[in-house]
Amino acid sequence: MRRSSSVQRVALLSVHTSPLAQPGTGDAGGMNVYVVELATQLARRGVEVEVFTRRTSSEQPPVVETADGVRVRHVAAGPYEGLAKDDLPGQLCAFTAGMLHAEARHAERHYDLVHSHYWLSGQVGWLTADRWDVPLVHSMHTMAKVKNAALAEGDAPEPAGRVIGEQQVVEAADRLVANTDAERRELIDLYGADPAKVVVVPPGVDLATFAPAPGRAASRARLGVPADAEVLLFVGRIQPLKAPDLLVRATAELLREQPWRRSRLRVVVLGGPSGSGTAHPDSLADLVRSLDLEDVVRMAPPVARAELADHYRAADVVAVPSHNESFGLVALEAQACATPVVAAAVGGLRTAVLDDGAGAGTGEGTGLLVPDHTPRSWAAALRTLLDDPARRTAMGARAARRAQGFGWGATAEATLEVYRRAVQDRAAERGADPR
């Protein structure tokens, strides 16, 4: 029996990182937030959502039902602990087998489509969608060719196997979801994606959690931050790509130029180690010591979302110095809390942040975009905003207003339309096929 173009059941794939994991630790980051929020919003719209992710602990139950009606299925594929992300390609066959086994208990074409996230999931999605004869929708989140073109110091290039794997997924997918027009262009120019298959759907922000507050006093009091402190905030995994070291070096440069600022300046780094190692946090702590900034820079582990919102609201400026971002959810969350952002002028950050320009600014921006990754340029940008509280306040107000257009509900609605068109096209391809 043929199914209509309506979308009733969706299989979301997040192989390498669980949507239930704490963002900012291990391999958990913005993609985790994306998958959780998308799944939740789809469920609220009557879509049955099942998320497949690799089991990483013997304590994880096979299936978890979230309060919002999303089913998260932990698939056994390789050892539970100690398996590096780079070794996961060797477990994709096992993961695929686990997915097929789970689906075998259902009627034919139980899922209307597969939506895979990141290239590892895309490899599994390619096979399972083909086996189930349903469309494959894929979100890259990051791309090897883009990352390799802008490698951070100390970061290893992505291997050829990933580049090939991404190319295969791009060619196999029925639809490719890009976060921004820039990402759409990269998919077309670097991977030869069919322009008709690439659809731009901006990510969202939880506007109920990340929202402005009247002043910063309450948030600072809850966090124990002095009312007169000047606070710079970094949120993200401690890895070369995210460049927290650049913020530390820029802080040292800033204090060399304005030593009087030291007693009030506080730089907060919220994030954990990337993957299963701790080398990067240790090296960042060593850098802080070598620059004699232990009284200025405070490193802390990731926090729950409500507390994270307090950190955004308590900050004067949020710094996002990444070497590349497909969008930059941290920048959007900060702006939703009415905090201006200083970000690198790369990737999706050029969409997430409206540059207020140099000098007195244009009066339209929500932050500053820095054109390079030198400590001097970053110190200058940070100093510009720290020296001008009125400009920060105006920027923050504009940022909060702009963030209202990025709710996750809008992301889900646009994604659902992508799903409907993919399902409709597949139904048309089947024609009179009675299966």
UniProtKB/Swiss-Prot annotation:
It holds the Pfam family Glyco_trans_4_4. UDP-N-acetyl-alpha-D-glucosamine binds at Q22, P23, G30, R237, K242, V303, E325, E333. It comes from the Bacteria. GO terms for biological process: mycothiol biosynthetic process. 1D-myo-inositol 3-phosphate binds at H16, D27, A28, G29, G30, M31, N32, K85, Y118, T142, R162. Its EC number is 2.4.1.250. It is an enzyme of class 2 (transferase). GO terms for molecular function: acetylglucosaminyltransferase activity; D-inositol-3-phosphate glycosyltransferase activity; magnesium ion binding. It catalyses: 1D-myo-inositol 3-phosphate + UDP-N-acetyl-alpha-D-glucosamine = 1D-myo-inositol 2-acetamido-2-deoxy-alpha-D-glucopyranoside 3-phosphate + UDP + H(+). Mg(2+) binds at Y312, R313, A315, T339. Keywords: Glycosyltransferase, Magnesium, Metal-binding, Transferase. Belongs to the glycosyltransferase group 1 family. MshA subfamily. Homodimer. HAMAP family: MshA (MF_01695). PANTHER family: D-INOSITOL 3-PHOSPHATE GLYCOSYLTRANSFERASE, GLYCOSYLTRANSFERASE. Catalyzes the transfer of a N-acetyl-glucosamine moiety to 1D-myo-inositol 3-phosphate to produce 1D-myo-inositol 2-acetamido-2-deoxy-glucopyranoside 3-phosphate in the mycothiol biosynthesis pathway. This is D-inositol 3-phosphate glycosyltransferase. The gene is mshA.
